[in-house]
Amino acid sequence: MSTEVVEEFDADYTGRHFLSVEDMSSDDVMRIIERGRQFKAGDAPRVEPGHVAINMFFENSTRTMTSFQMAEHRLGMKILDFDPGHSSVTKGESLYDSVRTVDAIGAEVAVIRHSTNHYYDYLLATGMLGLSVVNGGDGSGQHPSQCMLDLMTIAEEFGHVDGLTVAISGDIVHSRVARSDAQILTRLGANVVFTGPREWMDHDVTRLGTMATLDEVIADVDVAMMLRVQHERFDAGPDFSATDYLHTFGLTDERAERMKPHAIIMHPAPVNRGCEISGHLVEAPSSRIFEQMGNGVMVRMAILEQVLHGRETK
């Protein structure tokens, strides 16, 4: 199928929850991207204001949480405050009971980030929730909204996804971004190459593409997507050196100079400057890292609008 950006948003495309890219067809993905582009161009929301959202982040976040908050604000939603550190979670309350509580008091949409892979399966299997769940990231499983903003950024840059060569580089095994992006990029016809330490590869992800060193592929890529070294998910040990990692696996100045003139640099952030990427390359002319963040608001508006439509039709 064609992966050109869809020109018309199908208002009938709805889903009550937004959980995983595995649930989405290629058309679903491209419709969200196009709706995000319409929001970026100034299109008005197609939902009534006043819906109630709550953002339940059990892992630290700057970009995803504030991006969802801004998206909710622009859609005219009311936002309930939630801080796990000052909630009954500290008293032993389970995720399920926390979500059931906010459901009972009137939240319509819960954006949830949790360290447990597929946490949403248990929540929804009970059949007891009236609210909609939007996955803000589950462990090393999925990060579907990040995938949408990455795809929007690539589509804006090139006008298409099929035929592009995308290097996903770094800590693959701990990265929900790598998993989600690789699944959709390959489905849309991109050539995905994985680079990084061999011990940080994950066959369930790397089987979707090929493996190489960054030096072997950097001159051929259209997109160099660098991943953060996720120190909070493993112990790299006392011998880990950011300088050595950058020299061996990261995007150095020398490697960046070998990229094609039209190639772009991406990173889901937060960035460990001087580790995955030379510090000044974060804001180089070829970098789209901060454009990704801006696009995150737009696609999350599209996701929330879709979920609200889904609540009305299902």
UniProtKB/Swiss-Prot annotation:
One GO MF term attached to the UniProt entry: aspartate carbamoyltransferase activity
Source species of the chain: Cutibacterium acnes (strain DSM 16379 / KPA171202) (Propionibacterium acnes)
Name this protein carries in UniProt: Aspartate carbamoyltransferase catalytic subunit
Its job: Catalyzes the condensation of carbamoyl phosphate and aspartate to form carbamoyl aspartate and inorganic phosphate, the committed step in the de novo pyrimidine nucleotide biosynthesis pathway.
Lineage start: Bacteria, Bacillati, Actinomycetota, Actinomycetes, Propionibacteriales
Annotated Pfam families: OTCace (PF00185), OTCace_N (PF02729)
Highest taxon, organism lineage: Bacteria
GN (gene name): pyrB
GO cellular component, one term: cytosol
Functional pathway: Pyrimidine metabolism; UMP biosynthesis via de novo pathway; (S)-dihydroorotate from bicarbonate: step 2/3
